[in-house]
């Protein structure tokens, strides 16, 4: 749930391992 991935997912996917898309940013936990 924390925006610590430094990645956006405007296309709906996250490339960072362990991160999920919470549009429009990737989050972890």
Curated annotation (Swiss-Prot):
This is Cyclotide mang-A. Probably participates in a plant defense mechanism. There is a cross-link at residues 1-29 (Cyclopeptide (Gly-Asp)). Disulfide bonds join 5-19, 9-21, 14-26. Belongs to the cyclotide family. Moebius subfamily. This is a cyclic peptide. Keywords: Disulfide bond, Plant defense. The presence of a 'disulfide through disulfide knot' structurally defines this protein as a knottin. It comes from the Eukaryota. GO terms for biological process: defense response. InterPro entries: Cyclotide, Cyclotide_moebius_CS, Cyclotide_sf. SUPFAM superfamilies: Cyclotides.
